Amino acid sequence: MNEQYSALRSNVSMLGKVLGETIKDALGEHILDRVETIRKLSKSSRAGNEANRRELLTTLQNLSNDELLPVARAFSQFLNLANTAEQYHSISPKGEAASNPEVIARTLRKLKNQPDLNDATIKKAVESLSLELVLTAHPTEITRRTLIHKMGEINNCLKQLDNTDIADYERHQVMRRLRQLIAQSWHTDEIRKQRPSPVDEAKWGFAVVENSLWQGVPNYLRELNEQLEENLGYKLPVDFVPVRFTSWMGGDRDGNPNVTADITRHVLLLSRWKATDLFLKDIHVLVSELSMVDATPELLALVGEEGASEPYRYLMKKLRARLMATQSWLEARLKGEELPKPAGLLTQNEQLWEPLYACYQSLQACGMGIIANGELLDTLRRVKCFGVPLVRIDIRQESTRHTEALGEITRYLGIGDYESWSEADKQAFLIRELNSKRPLLPRNWEPSNDTREVLETCKVIAEAPKGSIAAYVISMAKTPSDVLAVHLLLKEAGIGFAMPVAPLFETLDDLNNADDVMTQLLNIDWYRGLIQGKQMVMIGYSDSAKDAGVMAASWAQYQAQDALIKTCEKAGIELTLFHGRGGSIGRGGAPAHAALLSQPPGSLEGGLRVTEQGEMIRFKYGLPEVTVSSLSLYTSAILEANLLPPPEPKDSWRHIMDELSVISCETYRGYVRENKDFVPYFRSATPEQELGKLPLGSRPAKRRPTGGVESLRAIPWIFAWTQNRLMLPAWLGAGTALQKVVEDGKQSELEAMCRDWPFFSTRLGMLEMVFSKADLWLADYYDQRLVAKTLWPLGKELRDLLEEDIKVVLAIANDSHLMADLPWIAESIQLRNVYTDPLNVLQAELLYRSRLTEEQGKSPDPRVEQALMVTIAGVAAGMRNTG
């Protein structure tokens, strides 16, 4: 195997060996032997040995109920260890620096070599960099927080073992620690006992900030500064921090009745409390380090006689006292106590920034730049990135909730039923009320619980410290009145500033109408005055793909963005496109660099705002070094997209995409919506029903408890198909459409699109990634074990379709095998398959036993149920995504 991966393979093998020793110590030699036999059979089966494949199936089918859980846990834990080794490999000196900060240097050199770009243009593009990452809880990190922490510790051990100068006794110590951590993981229950609450999810987000981003962001800025100095002779200004973090945890109430106004209020306080806690740690360090005496007259004037002997320390101690007073007040508020605000309560970033920056300027002026640019600079940058709120919150709610609230208000006032009015009448009413000086809400009126909740949420926004709430996102937005309605409700709550309100267009029809909706809004004078030249629009990836299939959805997303960019440019509006991508391909996920460069020209000029979801947060920001790599990749992609924009697609390419879109959507919906066998097949061939039992996120899996595929959220829909390895939502319809266009004699045109148009080549690359993870024999095995014989023909049809799709994509890409241009990912999938395959076979067996017990009216066997949950978590680790 490729030399490049030998370090990764040896780490994986070493971790596997330690896990084996742990299993032997815990359960005895016979269980370890059983696990080893299964592993060897799986490896041989993967290499094409049919006899061993049959033996693998028989061995797993014959496991007793007592053996199920240990075997499932062994393979699941191994995959977590393999993922940890892989994450370390991506940042280790021996790894393929697939995500190394070097990427910025490469991009800057590439830009400097462009004849029509000069240093001043590149510098201007750097100064306008803006990257906002929005952390969301779903599709939900399936791995428990306690295990994530242990994985981080294991990563540190691998780092120490990589040091060639390590002494033997130190190596023994590190190995002992590694054994302890793997044993701790083995003896920890990997499945949560209950669903996390929205507050638990928010705390998980804060833990990511504390354990990784807090150190990762300043490190990234140092790296960026170094590369800019080296390549452009340009230093980043101290107050320039192009990256910020926002969270949906505790703010996203779309379809989640557990996120209430009170929860949002609580999470806002908790977030501020965590910020004071982290800044206090920074200030403790600065109090200890800034013992210098020399200071500028300005600083001495600031500290007065009292602080003249140690001016920096004096200022830091005063700031520490303010932070402590703020923290105490926040603690009391979190306990429900109403206390008067203390003098000096920290509510704005400037209050933190000013004393720190005064110290920085004085140190620089007194020739102590080396000290100024140490811990102090890192803290200043954290103030700019995180500040008093730590992370800002987005509020998200579905459009119909606002319509229903206004309907209830208008009916009470006796002026008609807002819900039944035409769009023109709704707009006329909303604009009249927005311009009116009198309040709309009647006094002493008792609204329904749902309406009260909507109004209370608006009140929380109005009362929150300015800057702690980033935007109000309206899901399932369809009309201009959906946006105006939110502005009116916020006005009624007494909001004193222009809150960005972002419509989220997420079905195929809504994406196609997005430009019309925004054009109508921008033609309203009142609205133009309110937004002051800035507009945010969110593009939904997951629901549009679930609605129409990935090919039609991705083309609709591209066209919607393209039209919005042109409309806003013409109107002189600065547009920020907010990308609601998922981690998986079926929900719009793609390697960051490729995905950004495949967007329409101009789409990143207003900066990048993108959701980072669930388990992807750990893969991309789980460690400070990985954070540096991920932020560097985003930075280089934004610079490249803005300075070397992709070409406008030729008209003939657009026509082909229109054709592909129509055929793929018809094919996709023909199966998913119109084939009467499809829903029963889906329910039996995947663990969709069992997934509902997994205590994953705080959000219910369905928008409506009854109903078919359309009522399922995009996440369980993808998750279920990922589990049985058919990966259906991520490819269905795409290959059929490509095949039809090839048959029409346009293969050479498709090849040109693949070569010269990043949008199209990224689509094909994403299909290849999905095909690499899909597995025909496993999908077939699920059918044989779980599906009624009458439905077998449908399963066979879908698998045949998948096989044909793979051939057509390889033909267009001119490749002999999948992932030819990304060997690192192919290697990674190959490495994990040996461990994922037994989990898939075992899962099918467990689903069979579990359903049989249910059919017989017996109570479920807890050993089977627990082992099933472990296989679901294990396959998710093997596939590197949940939904």
From Swiss-Prot:
Similarity remark: Belongs to the PEPCase type 1 family.
Function: Forms oxaloacetate, a four-carbon dicarboxylic acid source for the tricarboxylic acid cycle.
GO molecular function, one term: phosphoenolpyruvate carboxylase activity
UniProt source species: Salmonella paratyphi A (strain AKU_12601)
Protein name: Phosphoenolpyruvate carboxylase
Family annotation (PANTHER family): PHOSPHOENOLPYRUVATE CARBOXYLASE (PTHR30523:SF6)
Cofactor: Mg(2+)
Catalytic activity: oxaloacetate + phosphate = phosphoenolpyruvate + hydrogencarbonate
Keyword NADP: no
